[in-house]
Structure formats: C-alpha cells, structure tokens
Amino acid sequence: MRFFVFLFLIVGCWCDVQILIDETGRYNITVNNQVWLRSSRMAIYADDQWYSTENTSLPLANITTAEGKDSTLGSWNETRLTYLLIRKQKTTPIVARIRQWSTVSALTFYLETGDLELTTNVTLHVDDVRTVFPSFLIEKMDQNDRRGYFTVAGQFGGQDDKHAGLWNASSRVVRLGYHGGPVVLFNLTEQGEGDTLILSPLSHFMDTSLTQTTRASQSILEYGVAGSMTSVPANYMQAFIVYYSEQGVNKGAREWGQTLQRVYNRTNEYRLNDLSLNYLGYYIDNGGYYCHNTLPGTNYEDTMIEIAEQIDIPYHYMEISAWFYYKGVRGGVSNWTARPDVFPHDIPYLHRRLGNLPFIIHNRYWAYDAVYQDKYAWILDPEGGTSLPASNDSFWLDLLTEARDWGVILYQQDWLSLQSIWFRPILTEINLGERWLTSMGQAADQVGLNIHYIMAYPRHFLKALEIPRVTQARGSDDYAINLMNHTEPQWNMGITSMIIDALGIAPNKDVLWSTSVQPDSSYGENASEPLPDRAILMATLSTGPVGVGDRINYTNLERIMRCCRQDGLILKPDRAITTINALVADWADNEGVPQGELYSTQTTM
C-alpha cells in the first residue's frame, strides 16, 4: 500500500506533525511519530440515502496534489481526493482537499460537494450531519495512550454543557451536535502543558456541526452540514481545521483563535475601543437588584433617574433590559419599542434627562406576531411560535438606527440559542442563520454600534469571527442563578473564557452585587452574594464588562474601586482569565469531574 507523506516543519518546535494519506484516501494525523487521529468514512446524504466510501456508492476516482499561496496564511500544499457521486443519471465529482501550511501549524480540510444541488425529502436529525469530511475515530491507540479532551457546548458560549474526559471509544465527546463547539485534544502525561490539537469548523459556522456516531463498534467524530438541512446548494464548500500546538491547552487555544481571526481578517479595534468594556456600568438585567423590581410606586423611567442620582460610583453607561419592550407569542419580542408604562416619556427623553448618558440595550428572539411583518420581508414559523427578518438589511438598519438615536452604544442580542432552535427555518434552510447574523452585524457597523451575544451556542461566536462589531459574549449563566443557589458556580467561566477570548471577543460574567445581602429583591428572601470580592474579581479579569447591579445605598464603594481608576476606567489584564492547563488535565483525567478552580491571566506593565 502506498502512502503520500507530508511533513510540517514548525518553526521553533522540536516535534513534527505528519499527515499520511494512503491510496484508498484514508489519512492519519501523527504527533511525534505517534498516531493521534485515524480517518473514517467520507459520505454524502442525498435523495434519502447515503453515498459512502464504506461501499461502492462513492468511489475514489483519483488523488492529485497542488500547491499555492494564500495572502493571509502563506504557502500551502494539498492533496485532492476526487470521488464520483452518481445520482439522477449524472456523475458529479466530489472533491475533498487536505491542505498543509508552511508557516501555520494546522491542517485544513475542504469538501466541495459538486455542481448539483443535494436534495432530500427525508431529512436527518439536526444533531447529525449530511456531508461527512473529515471524520476521525475516537479511540485509545494502545495502553500507553493517555490523552484527554474537553469541549464547550450549549448556551452561554458552551458553559451549559462543557465537559471533559478521556479520549477513548466509550467517551461521549459530542453529546448534541448542533449545540457543540470546538474539541480540544491533549496529552495527559504532560498535564496539558504540551502537545495539543484543536478541532473546529472553519466556515459556514451556522450550518455545519461536529457529531459523534457509532459504526461497526467504532466511535467516530464526523464534521459536515447539519442533518436537518433540506438541501445543500450546488458548488457548496465546507471547511474544517485541525490546529496543532506544542505549548499546551491555553496557548494552543489562543494560537488557534488567532489563526481563525487572521483567516477572517477580524479587527480588534472595536473591542479595544468599546466604552462598555473599558468603563464601569450599571446593569438592570437578570441578577441586577432592580430587574423586574422598580422603586415602590414608580416606573423604570423614575427608577433609573433615581439610580443615576443615588448610586455613588463612576459608571459611564446604564443598561435597559428585557422589561422595556412588548412581548408576544411564546414570550418573544413583538414590538421592540418602549412600553409607556415603563418609560412614559420614551427613551430619548430619559437619555437627555440623564445628561446624555449612554445606554446598552437588550433584545431577544422574535415572536410569531411581531409587528414588523407588514413592512419588511419576514419569515414566520407557526410551529415554533417565532419569526425572523428575512435577512432584510433595511430592517436591521432601521432598527439599529433608531436604537442609536435613543442613545444606545451597544446592542445585546440575547436568547440566540432559542432563536436558532425554536425557529425551524434556521435548521432547514442553509445560509439563513448566516444571513441573519451577518445582516445584523453589517447594520450595526453602519450605525456605529457594538454587539453583545448572550445565550449563544459556540456556533454563534464562531460566526462572530466575520462580525467584528461583536465585541463581547456571555461566558456564564445569568447572575440571578448565583444569588438564588450558591451551589451553582455561575462565576466559573475559565473554560468558556479560553475559547471566547481566543476568537477576539471579550467574555462577560454578567452583572454583580458588591454587598452580600440586599433586601426585597425579586430573587427571594434568601438571595445573597456569598463572595462579592470574587464576583468583582472575575468580572474584572474576564476583560468583559464590569456591571454593578446594587440596590441604592447598598454599593460597597471600596470594593468596586479596587477594579478601576477614580474615573471608572477598568484595570483589566491583557487576556481573559482562564483555567490553568493542569486543572484542565485533571478535569479530563477524572472523567469530567472538576477537581477545583485555579485560574491565570497576564498583564504587561
């Protein structure tokens, strides 16, 4: 059997990474001459059936090589595997490409699905995939193989279902494909300080997933278009990256993220200059004292005026949260404008009344009965009770222009997860989710607003690589959870911060209390913050917003001012606080049971 061998020469690295491709199209990735990943099948689902390399339905026609230069990542050479898809009396070449780079320690995988649309009447589950390339066996190679993994998954940047374990066939690495995110694979014998691979999508982040299947008693990691998509357009191309670092989990994650930022030419300008990331703010969201809890006998207009006059900290903006707009079917937003019982004189009046104090403002998923459908192109989902603008740039431009005129500097897009899974067309129509977020981001850029993602799946903040106006994303659950249940460590965002920060986005811990007990809140009579210093510390070192949500006369000024200058400028580190490599390794080595919390960050003086 013949092998095609390609060798990475990684500058300053004592080890090498190889990709070996045999004459059947199978490939192995080795680290230090040890096999780390072996390929499985390549497959396409169309016409309600699978075409696969496992049988003769997707035969390999030829293997060729090519080389070239990318303006961003430099020189490359690649192997091209051409398969023949025979359907509807037509033969379509399907090209799978494996590219290696001369100056970047990564392998990139591309699948070109051919010049015919891939249609089907019977769709697969959303957590499955309908195009498969690449795919890797999840296996322990021998008795000396001690590798672990972790991954982020679920809401809040993957905080909800982040998990870790040993890399073997019995591990459930991907639990729900659509909810999942990057997979970090590392050497446990080095306590996470050495060889590391990061596996993640490289394109079409809203439409593609990693999934895990079992075939012939083998556990397999597969990447491709989400199984619920009804069709894949002609000439579609998906991309995937396997990034290698010899410098451990944290450094490897940062290098991976920096590489993706280079691919998408993401600028750091908006994050660096975001007022809400640089200065203290006052928050009234779920965990803030005044969330759904105005001063007695008043509305939010009066309450916010009183807060502005009485809260004695150098805050530079205030938050307007989910209590200000009209809600409709299934709790979605029906009309994103101020209710008169909340703001009798409307938001522009309040902005002027507070001396033109900037606002950050909340939004959620769109209700089925949203009032905009008569004026703009709008898609309805009666089954999910939700709706969405049909990637109509004029809608987002009108909406965010109005917000800017209210005094808004940051738009918070919350409930991203439910807008994605409750709105069926995003799961069935390829590119719709991409267009939704792109249109929002382009409009924000036109009017000069930044965006904060909340309740995001990993796919959302990966998509934000293409949307530089997304400057921040929540990496933890709502702070109210912490106030009501001290056994739920809402503050422990060291894993999600690692991934979010690597992508050029500031992780957000959510609002905080600076005093432990603040009576008569909406969170129950036993609500409290057991460790206010910890809450302030984690918010500060996250590099995200530091948002105070205290009751009037309950702010501990001494505590708050430890995190900032007298003018409210936050004294933040150079990178977000993250879990140290050794604790990540212990987490995996103990099959996903956390062994404590220990964090690190750094600052250049």
What residue spans do the PLM features occupy?
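Cleavable N-terminal signal peptides of Sec/SRP-targeted secreted and luminal proteins
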Residues: M1-C15
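Carbohydrate-recognition beta-sandwich/jelly-roll modules
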Residues: D16-M318, N335-D341
